[in-house]
């Protein structure tokens, strides 16, 4: 399966039990900031934004004072899982980022998708990739 198929079929799919509810944007990005696959709506990010995200995985709490920035959008960092998941909130939407051995799985959502639904979709794919040694 191509990386794009993972984004299209596992991240941008309908949320279980909620036909038509999908993540706004999604991507799989390598630890080196190379984009493996992304939805057409995924924001163009700056290298320093990705560096900040990687630093927060290695030093949990790094982004809390400044917020998480992606594509120029600022998210307030909310409770995640140290070294494994970063979650952010902005208005009625937000972001979930799951770290795997080689990549970061991104999901961005807006209402009616809930934070929990975004977490489920992103973390399920991230956990699968971890199980595959990726």
UniProtKB/Swiss-Prot annotation:
Disulfide bonds join 13-118. Pfam families: Profilin. It is found in: Cytoplasm, Cytoskeleton. GO terms for cellular component: cell cortex; cytoskeleton. Phosphorylated by MAP kinases. The keyword Nucleotidyltransferase does not apply. One of its GO terms (molecular function) is actin monomer binding. The modification Phosphothreonine is found at residue 114. SMART domains: PROF. Binds to actin and affects the structure of the cytoskeleton. At high concentrations, profilin prevents the polymerization of actin, whereas it enhances it at low concentrations. Occurs in many kinds of cells as a complex with monomeric actin in a 1:1 ratio. Belongs to the profilin family. The variability of the residues taking part of IgE-binding epitopes might be responsible of the difference in cross-reactivity among olive pollen cultivars, and between distantly related pollen species, leading to a variable range of allergy reactions among atopic patients. This is Profilin-2. It comes from Olea europaea. The lineage of its organism: Eukaryota, Viridiplantae, Streptophyta, Embryophyta, Tracheophyta.
């Amino acid at each position: 399966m191509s990386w794009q198929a993972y984004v299209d079929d596992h991240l941008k799919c309908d949320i279980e039990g909620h036909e038509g509810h999908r993540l706004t944007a999604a991507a799989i990005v390598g630890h080196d900031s190379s984009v493996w696959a992304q939805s057409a709506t995924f924001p163009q990010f700056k290298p320093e934004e990705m560096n900040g995200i990687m630093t927060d995985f290695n030093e949990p709490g790094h982004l809390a004072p400044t917020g998480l920035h992606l594509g120029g959008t600022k998210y307030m960092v909310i409770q995640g899982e140290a070294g494994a998941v970063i979650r952010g909130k902005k208005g009625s939407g937000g972001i979930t980022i799951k770290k795997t051995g080689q990549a970061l799985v991104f999901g961005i959502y807006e209402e009616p998708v809930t934070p929990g639904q975004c977490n489920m979709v992103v973390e399920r794919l991230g956990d699968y990739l971890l199980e595959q040694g990726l």
